[in-house]
Amino acid sequence: MTLTSVPAPVSLFPELELPPLPYHRPLLMIGHGTRDEDGRQTFLDFVAQYQALDHSRPVIPCFLELTEPNIQAGVQQCVDQGFEEISALPILLFAARHNKFDVTNELDRSRQAHPQINFFYGRHFGITPAILDLWKARLNQLDSPEANPQGIDRQDTVLLFVGRGSSDPDANGDVYKMARMLWEGSGYQTVETCFIGISHPRLEEGFRRARLYQPKRIIVLPYFLFMGALVKKIFTITEEQRATFPEIEIQSLSEMGIQPELLALVREREIETQLGQVAMNCEACKFRLAFKNQGHGHDHGHGHHHHGHDHGHSHGEWVDTYIEPTAYHEKIWQAP
């Protein structure tokens, strides 16, 4: 069969060696989606770089919402090439509702349309040593004389860790955990955690709390994979804070972007998916608790994906207030 996928450029990381795949199964890399063209293109470039490291199977980009191609189009591309098994990876940082609920719903639709296809659903990135080390290395760069000409000590510096925000408290808790793990032992005065939408405290409140420590420097860490409207919003607010409080050195790191550490992590997740070794802790899942409290069993049994605990959700009478993806997305822009 002919393998078609993202046109792969020359790899930016030819020295990066990935472990071999057990199977030559096509891979859907599923991004969140953004209306921002820069963010969309960066995700496509990320997928292309991953494909460039291994041409043994097609790697196909698609998006959950807000832009094209969507998940159904990605699945159709695999079907058109005659594949009967598909690995699907959510390129998401945390296991919020998109990962637990929305992507799985889309894969259910695909399974109904293509019952001959066997789907294998993988795991989000989560909290990993590779990502922690990446952020530590980026912070180390800000200690250089070029980035820190005033020589401000870490003890006089507050980290401001900015997450996207989620309706799922499990994911929000992971943001706090990541911030804490990054800060402990770093030598910085403290870390404040905030969100750009959905959740509280918001970024402006995060700045206010950071100033209470009377720091000489605040470093903003936007915990995002790729550029997009929300990252640009973080940068805009940071510029406003810099102009309002010129006595404080306010710096901001960029989003993570295309990094070899992330490409290696994708390979880990792809191998997990192929071997059926994906595992998640569902004990604190918001959706499980909602069903349990209303007398429903939490099925955890979407047949289309195989990952350790068979994470899925039986759709009973529980009312999902974010059932429309557009309504969920728009809430992130609403004022408290």
Swiss-Prot record:
For the keyword Metal-binding, the answer is yes
Cofactor(s) annotated in UniProt: [4Fe-4S] cluster
Q: Where does [4Fe-4S] cluster bind?
A: 282, 285
Per UniProt, Co(2+) binds at 32, 98
Residue numbers spanned by region Disordered? 296-316
What's a Pfam family this protein contains? Answer: CbiX
Q: In which pathway does it act?
A: Cofactor biosynthesis; adenosylcobalamin biosynthesis; cob(II)yrinate a,c-diamide from sirohydrochlorin (anaerobic route): step 1/10
Its keywords, alphabetically, are:
4Fe-4S, Cobalamin biosynthesis, Cobalt, Iron, Iron-sulfur, Lyase, Metal-binding
What does the record give as the reaction this protein catalyses?
Answer: Co-sirohydrochlorin + 2 H(+) = sirohydrochlorin + Co(2+)
User: Which terms in the Gene Ontology molecular function aspect does this entry carry?
Assistant: 4 iron, 4 sulfur cluster binding; metal ion binding; sirohydrochlorin cobaltochelatase activity
Which example biological process does GO assign this protein? cobalamin biosynthetic process
Q: What does this protein do?
A: Chelates cobalt to the cobalamin precursor as part of the anaerobic pathway to cobalamin biosynthesis.
Subunit (UniProt): Homodimer.
Its family?
Answer: Belongs to the CbiX family. CbiXL subfamily.
Q: What is this protein called?
A: Sirohydrochlorin cobaltochelatase
Per the UniProt record, the source organism is Synechocystis sp. (strain ATCC 27184 / PCC 6803 / Kazusa)
Q: Which gene encodes it?
A: cbiX
